[in-house]
UniProtKB/Swiss-Prot annotation:
<protein>
    <recommendedName>
        <fullName>Putative thioredoxin peroxidase</fullName>
        <ecNumber>1.11.1.24</ecNumber>
    </recommendedName>
</protein>
<dbReference type="InterPro" id="IPR013766">
    <property type="entry name" value="Thioredoxin_domain"/>
</dbReference>
<keyword id="KW-0676">Redox-active center</keyword>
<dbReference type="GO" id="GO:0006979">
    <property type="term" value="P:response to oxidative stress"/>
</dbReference>
<dbReference type="GO" id="GO:0042744">
    <property type="term" value="P:hydrogen peroxide catabolic process"/>
</dbReference>
<feature type="domain" description="Thioredoxin">
    <location>
        <begin position="1"/>
        <end position="158"/>
    </location>
</feature>
<dbReference type="Pfam" id="PF00578">
    <property type="entry name" value="AhpC-TSA"/>
</dbReference>
<comment type="subunit">
    <text>Homodimer; disulfide-linked, upon oxidation.</text>
</comment>
<dbReference type="InterPro" id="IPR000866">
    <property type="entry name" value="AhpC/TSA"/>
</dbReference>
<dbReference type="InterPro" id="IPR036249">
    <property type="entry name" value="Thioredoxin-like_sf"/>
</dbReference>
<feature type="active site" description="Cysteine sulfenic acid (-SOH) intermediate">
    <location>
        <position position="45"/>
    </location>
</feature>
<dbReference type="GO" id="GO:0008379">
    <property type="term" value="F:thioredoxin peroxidase activity"/>
</dbReference>
<dbReference type="GO" id="GO:0033554">
    <property type="term" value="P:cellular response to stress"/>
</dbReference>
<comment type="function">
    <text>Thiol-specific peroxidase that catalyzes the reduction of hydrogen peroxide and organic hydroperoxides to water and alcohols, respectively. Plays a role in cell protection against oxidative stress by detoxifying peroxides and as sensor of hydrogen peroxide-mediated signaling events.</text>
</comment>
<dbReference type="GO" id="GO:0045454">
    <property type="term" value="P:cell redox homeostasis"/>
</dbReference>
<dbReference type="InterPro" id="IPR024706">
    <property type="entry name" value="Peroxiredoxin_AhpC-typ"/>
</dbReference>
<keyword id="KW-0049">Antioxidant</keyword>
Length: 177
C-alpha cells in the first residue's frame, strides 16, 4: 500500500492569500502531512482545517508542514478561505490548500473515492526524505484527530532518530502540543 517512490509534480495552491505553484520537493528536509479532504464548503472539513491551523506552532516545532489537499480548484479554496470560521469557513488558514486537479496525489495512495467523486478523508505522513511513513483514512463523516497526527510525527521522529520502536499509546516525553 505504501508507494516506494512518489511521483511529484507542480501543484497550484492557495498559500498566504496568493495562488502559487508548489511541489513536494519544496519540503525535502521536513516531515510533510498530506491532509486529503473531500470538498470545500462542507461541514467536517473546516473543523479539521481550522484545527491544523490552530496547531501550526506544534507542527513547526517538529519541523513539519501540512498540505491541505482536495480536488476542488485553487479558486474555490481561495473563496472558502475568505469565509469566517463561524460560517463554516477557513479564514486565516495557516497551511497551503492544494488543488489536486488531475487526482495525481490522491491516486498514488489509492485515496480517490470514485463512487463519490472526491478524495477520501485521509492522512499521509512523509519523512524528511519524502518516504511514506503513515497512511490512514476515515469514513467521510468522521473527522480526524490532529492531536493524533502530532503524536504520530513524534513517533516517526523518535524512530528516525533512535531506530527504536513505539508501542501502542507511545507518547513523546516532550509534552508541548
Amino acid at each position: 500500500m505504501f508507494p516506494k517512490t512518489l511521483t511529484d509534480s507542480k501543484y497550484k495552491a492557495f498559500v498566504d492569500g496568493e495562488i502559487k505553484e508548489i511541489s513536494l520537493q519544496d519540503y525535502i528536509g521536513k516531515y510533510v502531512v498530506l491532509a486529503f479532504y473531500p470538498l470545500d464548503f462542507t461541514f467536517v472539513c473546516p473543523t479539521e482545517i481550522n484545527r491544523f491551523s490552530d496547531l501550526k506552532g506544534a507542527f513547526l516545532r517538529r519541523n513539519a508542514v501540512v498540505l491541505l489537499i482536495s480536488c476542488d480548484s485553487v479558486y474555490t479554496h481561495k473563496a472558502w478561505a475568505s469565509i469566517p470560521r463561524e460560517q463554516n469557513g477557513v479564514l486565516g488558514t495557516a497551511w497551503p490548500m492544494v488543488w489536486d486537479a488531475k487526482r495525481e496525489l490522491c491516486n498514488q495512495f489509492g485515496l480517490y473515492d470514485e463512487e463519490n467523486g472526491h478524495p477520501m478523508r485521509s492522512t499521509v505522513i512523509l519523512a524528511k526524505d519524502l518516504s511514506v511513513r503513515h497512511i490512514s483514512s476515515n469514513y467521510h463523516a468522521i473527522g480526524r484527530s490532529v492531536d493524533e497526527i502530532i503524536r504520530l510525527i513524534d513517533a516517526i521522529t523518535f524512530n528516525d532518530e533512535n531506530g527504536d520502536i513505539c508501542p501502542a499509546e507511545w507518547r513523546s516525553e516532550n509534552k508541548d502540543n
